[in-house]
Design a protein with these regions (language model features):
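Ligand-binding "clamshell"
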Residues: 160-184
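Short, 15-30-residue, compositionally biased linear elements
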Residues: 105-115, 323-339, 370, 374-377
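Mobile gating loops/cap/lid regions near enzyme active sites that modulate substrate access
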Residues: 187-192
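Extended hydrophobic/aromatic segments used for targeting, binding, or gating
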Residues: 89-108, 170, 178-182, 367-386
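Carboxylate/His-rich catalytic cores and anion/metal-binding grooves
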Residues: 43-47, 57-96, 143, 148-168
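Histidine-centered catalytic/metal-binding microenvironments
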Residues: 338-386
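Conserved small-residue motifs centered on glycine
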Residues: 211, 219-342, 347
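Helix-loop-helix "hinge/cap" segment bordering the ligand-binding cleft or interdomain interface
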Residues: 1-75, 97-143, 199-232, 351
Length: 386
């Protein structure tokens, strides 16, 4: 569990935040776009004024109006299409829940189709990084560090470029004026995750192992499992050992300077079982500056447009249903994401849509949705019993 805010205010509510280059906007005398049409015009301006941007904004290499990594979690551009059709866009796992409590698959909705058509139009206009469909994280970051992006997508812009030049792009009104942010599924359970640690039958001393696992939930240990540690020489550290206002031991986040927060964290954190609760902050650990920056800006930019009542929760399924879902996810998600990338890059969604829907059914989408619906209903019923 990693808590930082709750409900719609949880830091996990949005993963793939679009960051637009405010330095470039100012250079060209442009306002932050608020509609999909305005964004397209801004991207065109970035493309058509590449020489001016390169000269005045310190760009190393060709100007790239928009870049992303297709089907790559927080680096995917799906948040841009939330204003199309029904307003669900496309979540990371492709599920959403209507305000009536119906579980749907985002990648078979009409609004999704319209949004993908629009993204392909941006490709046709030469506004999208040609490598967006094949690049690895390291390539994506390297181009960002050379200040080449007008618009990019990630959890924290400091992982790609810097805080000074970028602002969060607000939720865009679609063709009919609809504005919505579809929150990430599981986000209301504060990063709750299952399977961080497993005791197998081959464990020779289960009592000792269980006692060791229990220590992973000690506050000072959990925050290190989650973020990283302190005192390592000749390398960036996440923390320094400090004291809270009461004189107790507290881990204080270090200033990482030009180091990427995610790269330092990945080098030091061990993950595994952990719990970081809201009431730990300023008692056992400081709130990290990058997370506070993200959370404050996320609330200011997106909170009012998080219109959906539900997200799909983190649920425990029977072994039988878990196995079924695993197989469905392999077939259905793989096919959906393969076609999504193809349609954004090459077009053809209108002509291939009916065949696509039929193939999704052949893969078992209706049964997949029925299983997900059953556990959503059980979860909602359990809330009423509390």
């Amino acid at each position: 569990i990693e808590q930082l805010g709750e409900g719609k205010e949880a830091i996990q509510a949005i993963g793939d935040i679009p960051y637009i280059n405010k330095k470039w906007l100012d250079c060209l005398g442009l306002e932050i776009p608020t509609t999909v049409d305005e964004l397209e015009q801004v991207l065109i301006a970035f493309r058509d004024n590449a020489d001016k941007i390169q000269e005045e904004c310190g760009v190393e290499g060709d100007v790239i109006p928009m870049s992303f990594i297709t089907n790559n979690g927080d680096q995917d551009p799906a948040i841009l299409i939330n204003g199309f059709g029904e307003g669900y866009g496309d979540t990371g796992d492709h599920f959403a829940v209507t305000d009536e409590g119906e579980v749907i698959y985002t990648a078979v909705q009409e609004g999704y189709k319209e949004g993908i058509q629009w993204l392909h139009h941006l490709v046709e206009e030469d506004l999208v990084d040609p490598e967006a469909f094949t690049q690895e994280w390291s390539t994506y970051v390297a181009k960002g560090k050379n200040h080449r992006y007008g618009l990019c997508f990630t959890w924290d812009i400091a992982n790609i470029d810097n805080y000074d030049d970028y602002v969060m792009l607000p939720a865009l009104a679609g063709p009919d004026g609809l504005v919505n942010i579809t929150r990430q599924n599981n986000s209301e359970t504060s990063g709750f995750d299952r399977g961080r640690c497993v005791l197998t039958t081959s464990c020779r001393n289960t009592a000792l192992a269980a006692a060791w696992i229990d220590q992973m939930y000690a506050p000072l240990q959990s925050v290190q499992n989650n973020w990283g540690t302190y005192g390592e020489e000749d390398k960036p550290n996440i923390f320094e050992l400090s004291e809270n206002a009461e004189g107790g031991t507290m881990l204080k986040h270090e200033d990482l300077g030009d180091n990427s927060p995610v790269e330092v964290r990945e080098a030091q954190s061990v993950n595994g079982p952990l719990a970081v609760l809201n009431d730990y902050y300023d008692v056992y650990v400081t709130q990290p500056d990058d997370a506070k920056w993200r959370l404050d800006n996320m609330h200011e930019t997106y909170l009012d447009d998080m219109n959906s009542k539900y997200v799909y929760p983190n649920v425990f399924m029977s072994i039988e249903d878990t196995n079924k879902v695993s197989q469905y996810d392999t077939d259905i998600k793989k096919y959906a994401e393969q076609m999504k990338a193809s349609w954004i890059l090459n077009g053809g969604i209108e002509e291939e849509w009916d065949e696509y829907l039929q193939k999704m059914e052949d893969y078992g989408l209706s049964d997949y949705l029925a299983i997900k619906q059953k556990y959503f209903d059980q979860y909602q019923a359990s809330l009423g019993e509390q």
